[in-house]
Amino acid sequence: MAKQSRPIASLTLSFGLVAIPVKLYSATLPSERISFHLLRQKDGSRVKEQYVAVADGKLVERSEMVKGYEFAKGKYVMFSAGEIKALEDEHSTAIDIGEFVPLESVDPVYFGSTYYLAPDKGGAKPYALLTMTLQKTRQCAVGRWVSRGKEHIVVVRPLEDGLAMHQLHFQAEVRPFKDLGIGRVKVSDAELKLAGQLVDHLKAKGFDPGEYVDEYKGRVQAAIKDKIKGHAVS
């Protein structure tokens, strides 16, 4: 982890009578996404987005807006910012662990955002003890965490000499694969053998993320440099 990294939050990893102070870090680096702005072609002037009321075509300021849920065609119930705020989960600095399960029992399809957990002041020894225990037992911790007013399911697992935390999707958010309706197809032993040979030909010892780079991003960056120099992009 880079020395200049700053924790997102200070939390407590708790289960039973155990409470481990931890610092939460994002596992991904700040996005270096290339952003394009919308301009007027004739003079390069920036354009801005405005909101217009469908009923009368008049401009609507943000201060005049509320959120609404469409419960029937063209019919809405409105919620103020205060009403929505009141529905949020109570703020908590705890990651409440409810159970320990084999890591392989958690399907990767449920994985969302990933974070790193580091020991906070006074938490080094229990943090190390939990890490080593999870490594030895090949288990992961499943719990709940409230972030930005919403409760999330999380999995805490050992990673190298520390802990990583994955935010999970709720079951209702994941489309069952069986809904695709993929039927069974008969294949011969010869076809299966040939497919196995193709896999063996491309088989590697393990996944190396360094082997893959964002080539599209590289092309866009090169094109931007050419444009700045006044060159045409073909």
Question: Where in this protein do the model-derived segments appear?
Answer:
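Boundary segments of small protein-protein interaction reader/adaptor domains
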Residues: M1-S234
